[in-house]
Amino acid sequence: MSAVLVLALVLLSLTCVTDAISDACLTCICKQESYGCTQIGCRMDGRSLSCGYFQIKKSYWIDCGRLGSSWEACADDYNCAVRCVRAYMKKYIGKSGCTANCKNYARLHNGGPKGCTKPSTLTYWNAVKNQGCSINS
């Protein structure tokens, strides 16, 4: 019986690992958001401010767990921003009803917690694809 339990835990852990956003997909999103994945600071995006490599909004930063010393500091620190994006994706991919792939991660990043279901985020996905990613990246 314990061998079955161990096998189940191993399979579950593999599922969790494979559902994580890949480095390749993160890079494509970063390139799209900050003109080649560069530190660009904060900019107005519609009616709200977006900051850093991934153009993270304050509400996104709160949802990712308030990493770093502040929203702007985390967004402008590549490693902190990556941790924030990974945490956000982990939090919402399972709740969104969408499968874990680069297309849906990009759409979540652009459109919020249910972004992968919004037709308006398909244009963003096409822009991310143009940065060199595919659905399976």
Swiss-Prot record:
Q: Where is the I-type lysozyme domain?
A: 21-134
What are the protein's GO molecular function terms?
Answer: lysozyme activity
Query: Pfam families recorded for this chain?
Result: Destabilase
Q: What is its EC number?
A: 3.2.1.17
Which InterPro entries does the record cross-reference, listed alphabetically? Invert_lysozyme, Lysozyme-like_dom_sf
What is the first-listed, main subcellular location in coarse terms? secreted
UniProt record, GO biological process = defense response to bacterium; killing of cells of another organism
Question: What keywords appear on the UniProt entry?
Answer: Antibiotic, Antimicrobial, Bacteriolytic enzyme, Disulfide bond, Glycosidase, Hydrolase, Secreted, Signal
Q: What does this protein do?
A: Has bacteriolytic activity. May play a role in digestion and in the host defense mechanisms against invading microbes.
**PANTHER family on file:** DESTABILASE-RELATED, INVERTEBRATE-TYPE LYSOZYME 2-RELATED
Q: What is this protein called?
A: Lysozyme
Organism listed in the record: Ostrea edulis (Native oyster)
